[in-house]
């Protein structure tokens, strides 16, 4: 009854108006699952490759080739497979592609089938996707890292750092955390308006004001936290995504117009940690700068969460190599960086084995698909990045987490400060 009998893909649009792949997998029982693949703006060089048409349509960003690959070559390979064996399905897709980065069929084509199959199985069993992924142990609601000021490639402003996030880890429940974040977000909007700054938003729903420095952005956020009635560092902490590969060249980091070598970058980070309640730094060094990563990890790993995104690209092999080299203490998990659910789950398992925190993440080019909300709870990841408190493709994930919390009832647990305990001693 769980055999795949049909696979249908189509070209749809993501939150930036760019094409992406949506796939429906239909089972013999009549159950089906639909999944839409996201797309990133700042991408790691070793990410799995999303296939684009590179023709006149959509300025070269069409995905009709990927759609055709799903509807033809992939469909022929997976029709008849048992959908209850996610590993067999994903290995079939990996072998069919037969490249290291899924450049033949496209990671966007492969992932859409992988995700849709998992959702179809959950629907056949009549259980939520998170329960299918994690069973009876799936009950931890993640702490949200909410991107409320955008910079870098996510916004057209002078800020070098890509994301300024609030972390409501002092809440007792996920719903309380969401409320705290929303109240702070709207308070920040008022403060920016009062000070003459525009309140237009970037790709991920955060504001993109023309602030001149990292410190200025953080200070606005701290004022918003306090004015909303919360205590910075106690109720709500701050997290930053440097996306440092975007401003690293020839061994030098250029941040807000200032240049730093490896040691200077360390000093810059230490100064931020000493002056502000920062709990997490994502990609503070470039993926190309192993020594810089090692310096930061050696000096700061007991003080702050150091998250590898471009550094690890959700790739189990690359992640294990990075662990061996002493880089980072946490990993960002993005399904489309690696291209299958099975490989994603393998990477999460490695993180848990070696004591690395895991943060499930969206992409800047998102969709209404809520798969990552279920992945966060299903794997008890403890943290999620899914944007700001605006734009419906971001809110969709938060709303789904509210539904999951309600479904779990008294069994639901909010990850809270326990997720960051090593850095709060």
Swiss-Prot record:
Main location: cytoplasm
Cofactor requirement: Mg(2+)
GO cellular component, one term: phosphopyruvate hydratase complex
Recorded metabolic or biological pathway in which this protein acts: Carbohydrate degradation; glycolysis; pyruvate from D-glyceraldehyde 3-phosphate: step 4/5
GO molecular function: magnesium ion binding; phosphopyruvate hydratase activity
Reactions it catalyzes: (2R)-2-phosphoglycerate = phosphoenolpyruvate + H2O
Residues the entry annotates as binding (2R)-2-phosphoglycerate: 162, 334, 363-364, 385
Enzyme nomenclature, EC number: 4.2.1.11
Keywords on record: Cytoplasm, Glycolysis, Lyase, Magnesium, Metal-binding, Secreted
Similarity-based family: Belongs to the enolase family.
UniProt-recorded name of the protein: Enolase
Organism (species): Hydrogenobaculum sp. (strain Y04AAS1)
Name of the gene: eno
């Amino acid at each position: 009854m769980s055999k795949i009998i049909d696979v249908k893909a189509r070209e749809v649009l993501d939150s930036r108006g760019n094409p992406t792949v949506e796939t429906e997998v239909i089972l013999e029982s009549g159950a089906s699952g639909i999944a839409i693949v996201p797309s990133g703006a700042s991408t790691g060089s070793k990410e799995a490759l999303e296939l684009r048409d590179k023709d006149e349509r959509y300025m070269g960003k069409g995905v009709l080739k990927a759609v055709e690959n799903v509807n033809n070559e992939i469909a022929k390979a997976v029709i008849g497979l048992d959908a209850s064996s996610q590993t067999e399905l994903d290995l079939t897709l990996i072998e069919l592609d037969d490249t290291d980065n899924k450049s033949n069929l496209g990671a966007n084509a492969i992932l859409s089938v992988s995700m849709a199959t998992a959702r179809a199985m959950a629907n056949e069993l009549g259980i939520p996707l998170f329960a299918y992924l994690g069973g009876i142990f799936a009950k931890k609601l993640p702490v949200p890292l909410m991107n409320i000021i955008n910079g870098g490639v996510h916004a057209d402003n002078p800020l070098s750092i890509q994301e300024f996030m609030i972390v409501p880890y002092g809440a007792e429940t996920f719903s309380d955390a969401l409320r705290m974040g929303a109240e702070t977000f709207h308070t920040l909007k008022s403060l920016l308006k009062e000070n003459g700054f525009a309140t237009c938003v970037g790709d991920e729903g955060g504001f993109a004001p023309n602030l001149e420095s990292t410190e200025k952005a953080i200070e606005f956020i701290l004022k918003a936290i306090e004015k909303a009635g919360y205590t910075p560092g106690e109720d709500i902490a701050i997290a930053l995504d440097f996306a440092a590969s975007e401003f690293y060249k020839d061994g030098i980091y250029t941040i807000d117009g200032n240049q730093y070598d490896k040691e200077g970058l360390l000093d810059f980070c230490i100064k931020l940690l000493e002056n502000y309640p920062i709990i997490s730094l994502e990609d503070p060094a470039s993926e190309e700068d192993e020594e810089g990563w090692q310096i930061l990890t050696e000096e700061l790993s007991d003080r702050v969460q150091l998250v590898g995104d471009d550094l690890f690209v959700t790739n189990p092999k690359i992640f294990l190599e990075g662990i061996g080299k002493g880089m980072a203490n946490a990993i960002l998990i993005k399904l489309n960086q690696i291209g299958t659910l099975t490989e994603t789950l393998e990477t999460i398992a490695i993180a848990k084995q070696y004591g690395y925190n895991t943060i499930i993440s969206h992409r800047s080019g998102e969709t209404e698909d809520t798969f990552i909300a279920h992945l966060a709870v299903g794997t008890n990841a403890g943290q999620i990045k899914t944007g700001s408190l605006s734009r419906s493709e971001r809110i969709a994930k938060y709303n789904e987490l509210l539904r999951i919390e309600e479904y779990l009832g008294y069994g639901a647990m909010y990850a809270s400060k326990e997720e960051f305990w090593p850095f709060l001693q």
